[in-house]
Amino acid sequence: CENRIKSLLVDSYQVTKHYLQSLSKLVTVIYIDDLNRFLYPVHTLICYGDYWRKFHYKEKYSNTNLFLGSKYIPLRQAFKNQEKKKIKPQVENLLFLSGGTDHFHLLEGFLEKLEKEKYQKIQVICGRYYDEYEKLRSQYVDFDHIHFHKGVRHMENYMMEADLAVSAGGTTLYE
């Protein structure tokens, strides 16, 4: 069948060895890893973290295509052609990024402890699955220099404007 899936890219922490084994019997599986939780039964393994050497992939995977290192970071096109960021001597603009959900309410904790008056602008970007967005935003309605956003497009604009960013893990750190 010409519409049959030939390859599948998997990027999830929820996978199990059994799941990947089952998929690998049906299609060519490409797995993005950064935890090295177990030996992944896949055709191709990508680890774009600079720490890939500590996982000893080359010794463990003799029959798997390996793509290791930061040259394989899946950056969005907008980040590939950015001009170099000019670093200011003083931090005036802050950027907080929670990732998708912020289960541990880190944004709330950061904002609570932060000396908010020290900064000209504070951008707070919540992931689209962050349930406490309206509650958090309403707590800072009296602060004109604190701006809240949810599920933004063009993240690169916020990053270029920021003098300092605090981020959840993931690809955002490379961006």
State each model region's role.
Residues 42-103:
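A nucleotide-sugar donor-handling region in carbohydrate enzymes
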Residues 89-162:
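Donor-nucleotide binding loops and adjacent catalytic segments primarily
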Residues 20, 107, 111, 173-174:
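Generic hydrophobic/aromatic pocket-lining and core-packing "Φ" positions
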Residues 160-171:
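Acidic donor-binding loop of glycosyltransferase active sites
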Residues 9, 30, 44-46, 123, ...:
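Hydrophobic/aromatic beta-strand patches that form the interior of the parallel beta-sheet core
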Residues 156, 174-175:
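Short alpha-helical segment that forms part of, or immediately flanks, the ligand-binding pocket
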Residues 33, 47, 98, 126-128, ...:
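Short beta-strand/turn micro-motifs composed of small residues
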Residues 1-61, 66:
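Active-site and donor-binding regions of nucleotide-sugar-utilizing enzymes
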